[in-house]
Amino acid sequence: MEKEADNKFRWVIKNFSSLGSERVFSDIFVVGSCKWRLMAYPKGVRDNRCFSLFLVVTDFKTLPCDWKRHTRLRLNVVNQLSEELSILKETQMWFDQKTPAWGFLAMLPLTELKAENGGFLVNEEVKIVVEVDVVEALGKLEESEEATQPLKKVKLEAFVESKGLLKETSSVKEEIIDVNVFHVLPSQVEFVSRVFERYPEIASIFQAKKQHLRTACMYVLLSLIETLCKSLEELSNDDLVGGDNALQYLKFSGFKVDWLEKKLEEVKEKKKEEQIGETRMQEMKVFKQKCSDIEALMEREKSKLLVTRGSPLTLDDVL
């Protein structure tokens, strides 16, 4: 991992075509007192046939429960033949205990990435530049020291995804319960059971055999439903973008989520109406203030007019 600036790093994935791991990780780097690293899926996630790329907070389990980082993220897959052809994607989001990872499932199609003389895969190397700007920080963290580790496949006790983005759990094993061959936490059993009771066919064509992929999909599903249950005041545009990413991931994974897609569209429409309503209210407040100013002006003019008119002249006044 080559540091180009305080918030800018370059990651070179070597021997790209011969990588056997489903996912690979960059070295760890530090920005905003958090330890981060990039995570890539060189073969894509399931059947989406795209190069997937995410930014992950590596030590989120050891951070205070109230930590948050509002982050501006720029991910650039470098075209080594022409900088103008590089693929750049940008987003802003809040990283926190529930969402310690964010990125793009479809950074670019694998056919484009691997194209001969395409410029992205040169000498079996793919180069990625990441820029991380911490816009706002909540929760006090201990100052982290920069650390690095070799690129490798990491063995995890669990691997989950939230809002379309993957996150790692710590190596500490938690109690888990099997619900329809999906491993969930005890606090999630009732909720997950209700989902399967209401929509028994939701995972009928889901074929992932590895438990960490099943867990990932279930956490995406729960996170999306949690987002849809937020009040419009709490719901942000970033939440809606994350909802779209989560829905895309679930559909790619083989989940039947037409009902969720419909609900998400309804919520997006309501959020749009709310924003339009807020804009109109603001305009009306301005108009009301103008009317109030005009009314006050009219009262002053009325007073002047009464003074001007005064009492009619008497005969004595005339003579």
From Swiss-Prot:
Keyword line: Coiled coil
Instruction: Give start and end of each MATH domain.
Output: 6-132
Against SUPFAM superfamilies, the record matches this protein to: TRAF domain-like
Q: Which Pfam families match?
A: MATH_2
Annotated coiled-coil segments of the chain? 255-302
Q: Does the keyword Coiled coil apply?
A: yes
Listed disulfide bonds for this chain?
A: none
Q: Look up the domain of life of the source.
A: Eukaryota
Return the protein name.
Answer: MATH domain and coiled-coil domain-containing protein At3g58200
What is the species of this protein? Answer: Arabidopsis thaliana (Mouse-ear cress)
Recall the taxonomic lineage recorded for the source organism: Eukaryota, Viridiplantae, Streptophyta, Embryophyta, Tracheophyta
